C-alpha cells in the first residue's frame, strides 16, 4: 500500500484539526471557558471599583472620573426640563441627584444597571470632552505658573540689568571714532534685529494666539517666515555687491556713493534751513562752529537721527563743552522728544516683560534677552543725541537713566495686568511693537551704519557682520523656544 505524499498528509491533518476545534462539543467540553452573561459585566465593574457586591458613592464617582464623565459644573434642576439641554456636561452631583442617590446610598447591580444609560448618554454626546480639555489645560497652567516672589524677583532683576545699559553711554565716548566700535555697534544692531524679530515670531505672537510650541508645532513654520525675510535680505545685499563691483569696473566709481553724498550746494542749503529754524543753535554751540568746517552734512535731519553720524558730530566738538552745566532752556527740543519717546518705549518694554513673567519665568527671560539686545545699541545712540542736543554728560546720563526707569513702571503694570487679566493682549501689542522696531526702525539704522564702509569700498566685512548678528539673534530665540520645557530655572 502506497503512503500518501507528505504535503498531502499535512494538509489533511490541519483540515481535521480545524473541524474538531470548531465543533460545539469541543467548546462545551473545554474546562477553561467561562460562561459569559449580561450580569458578568456589572459584576466585573463592582468587583474592580467596589467592595463586596455594591459601590459607595465615592467609588461610583471614581468610576465616572475614570470615564471622564461627571466633570461638569452645571445644575441638573436648571438643565433637565423636558429632555432639553441633555448635551450639557453634568457634574457627578447632578447625576446622583437625578437618580436619588445620597451619601449613604449603596449602589448594587440593579442600581448600577439603571445608572448605565446615563453614563452611555454622556459618553455618546461628548458633552464633557471640551470640559476635560479645559480642566487639563487649567491644571497644567496652574502647575507652570511662577510664584509672586519669582515674578517680581526675576522681573526686577531683568529690568535693572536692562536699565543699566543707559549708563554705558559715557564709557564708549572715547572709542566713538575707532573702527572696531562702529563694527561692534553694527553687530549689536543686527543682533537686536534678529532677537526682536524672532522673539515676535516664535514667542509673543504665538503666545497671543494661545499656541504651545511643544503641542502645536508652529516653530518650523515660524522659521520659514524668518527664512523668507533672510532670503530677500541676503539676495538684495549680494545683488548690490555685484552691481557695485560692475559699476566700479566700467565707470571707476560707485553710484551708491554719489547718491549718499550730497553736493556742496545742498549741504549749504541744509545748514541755512537749520539756521532759519533755530535748531542748529541747540545742536552746535557758537564756540564750536569753527571746528565743524567741511562737516555740514551732519545737520541734516535724517543723519541726526542715525547713530554713526551723530557720533561723528559729537567727536568733532570739544570735550570742554560736555562738562559745562547747561540751562534747561538752552537744551534743544530734540533732547526732550528723545527722552519722552524713549520713556514710552521703555514703559512698553516693561509691560511685555511683566506680562511674560506672569506666564512663566522662562518666557520672561526670553523677552528680556530680546529687549536687552535691542536696548544696548539704542541707549548708546540716544546718549549721543542728548549730548548733541545741548545737554552736559551729567544731564544726559540722568535723563537717559530716568527714561530707562520707566521700564519699572511698565513692569508693575504688566505683572498686575497679566495676573488678573489675560496676558495674550499684551503679547499681541508687544509682538507688533517688536516687529516695527526691528524692521522699520533698526533695519534702516543698520544700513546707515554700513554706508561709510560701503563708500570706502569695504563691503564684505559689514555684510558678514550683519549676517552674524541676524543669525545669532535667530538662533538664540529658536533654542529658547525649542527647549523651553527642558530648561528649569529656580
Swiss-Prot record:
Segments carrying motif HHHGHXHX-motif: 249-256
Catalytically driven reaction(s): Zn(2+)(out) + 2 hydrogencarbonate(out) = Zn(2+)(in) + 2 hydrogencarbonate(in); Mn(2+)(out) + 2 hydrogencarbonate(out) = Mn(2+)(in) + 2 hydrogencarbonate(in); Fe(2+)(out) + 2 hydrogencarbonate(out) = Fe(2+)(in) + 2 hydrogencarbonate(in); Cd(2+)(out) + 2 hydrogencarbonate(out) = Cd(2+)(in) + 2 hydrogencarbonate(in)
Cytoplasmic side: 177-184, 244-395, 444-458
Localisation per UniProt entry: Cell membrane; Apical cell membrane; Basolateral cell membrane; Early endosome membrane
Pfam family, one: Zip
Membrane topology: Multi-pass membrane protein
InterPro entries: ZIP, ZIP_Transporter
GO cellular component: apical plasma membrane; basolateral plasma membrane; early endosome membrane; late endosome membrane; lysosomal membrane; plasma membrane
Keyword Transmembrane recorded: yes
Topological domain ranges for the Extracellular compartment: 29-155, 206-222, 417-422, 480-490
GO terms, biological process: cellular response to glucose stimulus; cellular response to insulin stimulus; chondrocyte differentiation; gluconeogenesis; inorganic cation transmembrane transport; insulin receptor signaling pathway; intracellular zinc ion homeostasis; manganese ion homeostasis
Positions bearing carbohydrate: 75, 85, 100
Record PTM: Ubiquitinated. Ubiquitination occurs upon iron depletion. The ubiquitinated form undergoes proteasomal degradation. N-glycosylated. N-glycosylation at Asn-100 is required for iron-regulated extraction of the transporter from membranes and subsequent proteasomal degradation.
Record key words, sorted: Cell membrane, Endosome, Glycoprotein, Ion transport, Lysosome, Membrane, Signal, Transmembrane, Transmembrane helix, Transport, Ubl conjugation, Zinc, Zinc transport
Motif window: XEXPHE-motif: 374-379
TM region(s), chain numbering: 156-176, 185-205, 223-243, 396-416, 423-443, 459-479
Single GO MF annotation: cadmium ion transmembrane transporter activity
Signal peptide: 1-28
Function: Electroneutral transporter of the plasma membrane mediating the cellular uptake of the divalent metal cations zinc, manganese and iron that are important for tissue homeostasis, metabolism, development and immunity. Functions as an energy-dependent symporter, transporting through the membranes an electroneutral complex composed of a divalent metal cation and two bicarbonate anions. Beside these endogenous cellular substrates, can also import cadmium a non-essential metal which is cytotoxic and carcinogenic.
Family of this protein: Belongs to the ZIP transporter (TC 2.A.5) family.
UniProt subunit comment: Homotrimer.
Name under which the protein is recorded: Metal cation symporter ZIP14
Organism (species): Pongo abelii (Sumatran orangutan)
